[in-house]
Amino acid sequence: LPELVISDVMMPLMDGYELTQHLKTSSLTSHISVVLLSARAAHESRMAGLTQGADDYLTKPFHVDELRQRLHNLLTRQQTLRDYYHKQFTQPDAEFRPEILTDDFLRKLHAGIDEKLDDPAFGVDELARTVGMSRRTLDRKLAAVANLSANTVIRQHRLKRAAQFLNQGHNVSEAAYMVGYESPAHFSQIFKELFQKTPSEFTQR
């Protein structure tokens, strides 16, 4: 998937406004930055593009160095968000509060995992159906927004929730079953890979 799309407002078949709307309303492409270029400098034209979700709107004529700087800023912002989401899953000390995420796709993703959290059979295929995507599309989307696979996201979500349950006073076996692990021993092994501590050691901090 591209990180950024640059489009002229005036195009055959589909104008830039319609293209932006299609990109921003699709779960697969909603994270892609869109920059619209146009000779229309009127406030109404700019607002039409921004209302459809365009990340920037540049009127012609423009300086190439200004366009480059705007693109650089958008790509830097995307990378910052990607790093942030990646850290939420992979850093043991990162605060895990998916319900406050501003990204609709990620909120829906986390809610889907939580709904089946204690189901050992819940996996990527089921999660993909929950968010209305194919398995391949889900992996592509997660690679773009968090540089992670769907399998990794499910596993890390379960482990982060397990840590919360342990902090609430549940024992190791209870926490394991609550997040879909049928074997507390296997759960402890996977838990240690993320937190560098067994669940028992984690509760004794």
Predicted regions and their residues:
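Active-site beta3 strand of CheY-like receiver
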Residues: 1-6
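Receiver (REC) domain active-site loop signature in two-component systems and cognate sites
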Residues: 11, 34
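C-terminal output helix
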Residues: 62-71, 75, 83
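Basic/polar phosphate-binding segments, predominantly the helix-turn-helix DNA-binding elements
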Residues: 124-153, 177-198
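Terminal helix-turn-helix DNA-binding modules in bacterial transcription factors
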Residues: 144-182, 204-205
